[in-house]
Amino acid sequence: MNASSFSRRWICPAVAVFGGCALLAGCSSGHQTTSASNSTNTSVSNASIAQQGPQAGFMWSASEQTLRPILGVPGSSQFGAPMVTPGLYVAGGASTRSGVALLEDRAGQISLMSAATGQLQPLAGVHVSGAAQFVFSPSGLNAVIFVPGQGGALLLTGLGATDANSVQVQGLNSAAGLQSAAVSDLGQVVGASGTSPATLMLLTGNAAPVATLGGFGGIVFLPGGNALLAVDSANNAVELMPGNGAAPQIFTSNALRAPFAVAASQDGTTAVVANGGDDSVVRLDLTNAANQMRIPCTCKPDRLTPLAGNAVFALTGPGTSTAWAVDAAATVPHTLFIPAMVKQ
């Protein structure tokens, strides 16, 4: 699907404030929309998740097609009951930081959910064609939605609002199909196309190339600004692009082995990189390039999903076997396990 057809399918490529659904003349979502105020709550329980105690995070379970909370605190936690009826949604994602979740139903409708209360509201006029991926900014107040391989994306801002009508949506074009994307707390979006090499493109403002990587190993923004971390899997390197016109900083390490994902601490001082070449992650001190540490895991990392804490990230997802996480900010960085979830 090309960029223009993508934009028409999703929403007009301009900011729209839901409620009025103000689209530019000549633009159309191509769908009959449902007002958020008429939404049906399909969460499995009206009880507040917060009443179950502290949460270490929220994670989408692809095998069950539902969202689950991680109850407890890092190091002493377990998966809670499904937050939405399993099978009603085909894709989803959540921000532990903001307590916001986004879900895609079988018709491609995107809904906004408060992970704390379970309140679920469809976003009027926001549809996708295909199983979407949801990437949140560090604060969790912005998100970018894209379907891998399609040439376009949606930028959602104002996710901290309790009313879905206050969420703003902007359609973004990409000249090539996206395989990944990242969004900053300031609303800047960078998309990645291709694998070896991979091209990074700024999708907001004056769209332009950002960088070319020998191999794509992940991108993420640091909290609070537009500084971007980009991992080159072919050269086992991490590039920090300040976002202010200054020259990028390159981090290399013998511990980096075919990296495929990167995450940043909430204080912006630490990067965590997941290796594809062995069962480990690497902690990089962004203030001192010499301060590096390889953290082995008995698991095979397949993600870096932010959980509660400064630098706590899930390494594997919910399933019938033990899930794993890493606390990279601890005095002695270490991995943590989350017991296998119990089918509900």
Residue positions per predicted region:
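C-terminal motif of bacterial Sec signal peptides marking the signal peptidase cleavage site
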Residues: 23-26
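Bacterial signal peptide processing site
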Residues: 28-31
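Beta-strand-rich domains and repeat architectures in extracellular enzymes and scaffolds
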Residues: 44-72, 78-96
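Repeated scaffold domains used in trafficking and secretory/extracellular systems
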Residues: 46-47, 87-98, 127-140, 173-184, ...
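Conserved beta-strand positions in repeat-built beta-propeller and related beta-rich domains
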Residues: 60-63, 95-96, 102-106, 137-138, ...
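Structural motif
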Residues: 64-68, 108-113, 150-157, 196-202, ...
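Short loop/turn segments that connect beta-strands within beta-propeller blades
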Residues: 73-75, 114-118, 158-162, 202-206, ...
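A short beta-strand motif characteristic of beta-propeller blades
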Residues: 77-84, 119-126, 164-172, 206-212, ...
